[in-house]
Amino acid sequence: MTDVKKSIRANRGTELECLGWEQEAVLRMLRNNLDPEVAEKPEDLIVYGGIGKAARDWDAFHAIEHSLKTLKNDETLLVQSGKPVGMFRTHPQAPRVLLANSVLVPKWADWEHFHELEKKGLMMYGQMTAGSWIYIGSQGILQGTYETFAELARQHFGGSLKGTLTLTAGLGGMGGAQPLSVTMNEGVVIAVEVDEKRIDKRIETKYCDRKTASIEEALAWAEEAKLAGKPLSIALLGNAAEVHHTLLNRGVKIDIVTDQTSAHDPLIGYVPEGYSLDEADRLRQDTPELYVRLAKQSMKKHVEAMLAFQQKGSIVFDYGNNIRQVAKDEGLENAFDFPGFVPAYIRPLFCEGKGPFRWAALSGDPADIYRTDALLKELFPTNKALHRWIDMAQEKVTFQGLPSRICWLGYGERKKMGLAINELVRTGELKAPVVIGRDHLDCGSVASPNRETEAMKDGSDAVGDWAVLNALVNTAAGASWVSFHHGGGVGMGYSLHAGMVAVADGSELADERLARVLTSDPGMGIIRHADAGYERAVEVAKEQDIIVPMQK
């Protein structure tokens, strides 16, 4: 299996293995998801987020590869939970691939039924960008995490986290962005992580500065940095359910508390207190029911600590892993006393159609990304926050796999950037085509009552129609591949979400498709929030001449 792991890497350059650049882009991004620089456990096809996979099994992976190599420019490949199940003739402007991952009928939409199907080889968990083949490593969530802490700093600390201490946990593919996001905002952070390999990966990619297994050493480093007003990120090896209570008992002053452990998956994602990783693995294999019970009890204890910090004056927020829900199910009635990050910090951006816009250079040449960085500044010369982000990303972000970039852009801006990238491909300034996509966490693509759609103004938190409409409109608009998933971020039964990717290959046809997709996709966010009664979304719809039939 080690040999297989080493062999998975996206091709670079302009030589094609497939019959067209769209198919080639899909193949390269599928492989990029499993690049050892990118994936958490590539030998098991796991990309990030507990058991978020790129393909159902190795046979399915190789079948997908073969299908993409033979897929014609007027055909569409269908992928059901990581397994290729059909190829049909469609037309050149249709998506080359349509994917559905871990979608269960609501009455059966829980982890127990999912695991039954998974054991039978009938389903896989796609997370968000794992099964939709547009994961780019921790950078993929970095700016969203950075923007969250930046908005928190604006609301509570005068615009900077300098001199503050943040406590969090979880340094996996998503949580790994937290340390760098805090230090980019000039703060100090202690991030608790039970798996030392994950810590080492974050330090190796420069997302985290230091590591220790000693609470005393972590606190000493943190205090020194705070007093000096210097940013510092510290990974503390330990279990959050234990460490947080130790810090409480010692009376340590924490300014900000959040969490990004894989609490969405109690069986695979969260390690119960009192167990080493090896002991946890054995317990998981031998008595999974006991494991889940102990993990949920630890999560309850973890949330109790977060609530206690809140009582002591810390700013506490949930970072979308559903840990509050688990704690409430375990009998902690006030588990939702602290808010989720979307209603607290991100929703105003969603109302303007802003969200995570990412792209990857299929050439494999970092110079292509640096040229697009310059392009961003050329297109948006007055957006100083965007310029600052690009400068920091160039300085601090290590590319994982194919060189890539992410930034948050709004309605109109995404189309402008996409068409400009396509022009650079056409003129040869970029050495090969570029894929343009996003996280499923976006303004108009998710229904997730404990995360993206928490506390909607009109009470429409659980309405899943919007995520379905997003997938449908991106298919109609001509995205290169479109995905619809269940359970990403917060686990089975708690979310529905859609993703899209479009390929800028320099052609006039790509111009047409990019213009449609990069308009309708963020436009979904505006109409979704306008429909829910958000005044800013209504204003933006009017400003941008977006037709919302029943909107006054």
Swiss-Prot record:
Keyword ATP-binding: no
Cofactor list: NAD(+)
Domain of life according to the entry: Bacteria
Main location class: cytoplasm
EC number(s) recorded for this UniProt protein: 4.2.1.49
UniProt feature coiled coil, ranges: none
Top class in the EC scheme: lyase
Binding-site residues for NAD(+), renumbered to this chain: 49-50, 127, 173-175, 193, 198, 239-240, 260-264, 270-271, 319, 489
Active site feature: C407
Keywords recorded for this protein, A-Z: Cytoplasm, Histidine metabolism, Lyase, NAD
Reaction it catalyzes: 4-imidazolone-5-propanoate = trans-urocanate + H2O
GO terms for MF: urocanate hydratase activity
Pathway of action: Amino-acid degradation; L-histidine degradation into L-glutamate; N-formimidoyl-L-glutamate from L-histidine: step 2/3
Gene Ontology CC entries for this record: cytoplasm
Similarity comment: Belongs to the urocanase family.
Subunit structure: Composed of at least two subunits.
Entries under HAMAP family matching the protein: HutU (MF_00577)
Protein's name in the database: Urocanate hydratase
Natural source organism: Bacillus subtilis (strain 168)
